[in-house]
């Protein structure tokens, strides 16, 4: 696969699971002889939701919830066919969203 790059974008709510998955992908790619750029941490997306604490009265009493989406970017430069096979067979943790672009 001469001159090609594989771009892997990972998303998760828990940064520990995300970092473990990126370490697993990087070690697999390096073991099969590919060069890896990254992991590059992308900005964390924070969604905040504000709701009333009481269902009936008291508009001034509110509660906030937030959802954080952590993201990482990996570039695999000049992957070998063994790299692609190893990445396809890789079993990552549940809760990690993986997007792959060739």
Swiss-Prot record:
Q: Which GO terms describe its cellular component?
A: ribonucleoprotein complex; ribosome
A Pfam match: Ribosomal_S10
> Per the UniProt entry, what are the Gene Ontology biological process annotations, in alphabetical order?
translation
- Note the SUPFAM superfamilies from the entry: Ribosomal protein S10
**Which keywords does the record carry?**
Ribonucleoprotein, Ribosomal protein
Which GO terms fall under molecular function for this chain's record? structural constituent of ribosome; tRNA binding
**Disulfide bonds listed in the record:** none
Q: Which family does it belong to?
A: Belongs to the universal ribosomal protein uS10 family.
Subunit architecture: Part of the 30S ribosomal subunit.
* Entry-linked PANTHER family: 30S RIBOSOMAL PROTEIN S10 FAMILY MEMBER (PTHR11700)
Spell out the protein name for this chain.
Answer: Small ribosomal subunit protein uS10
């Amino acid at each position: 696969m001469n001159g090609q790059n594989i771009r892997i974008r990972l998303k998760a709510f828990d940064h520990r699971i995300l970092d473990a998955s990126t370490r697993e992908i990087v070690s697999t790619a390096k073991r099969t002889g590919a060069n890896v750029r990254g992991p590059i941490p992308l900005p964390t997306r924070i969604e905040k939701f504000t709701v009333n604490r009481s269902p009936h009265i008291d508009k001034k009493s509110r509660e906030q919830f937030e959802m954080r989406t952590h993201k990482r970017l990996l570039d695999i430069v000049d992957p070998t066919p063994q790299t692609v096979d190893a990445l396809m067979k890789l079993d990552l943790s549940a809760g990690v969203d993986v997007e792959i672009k060739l």
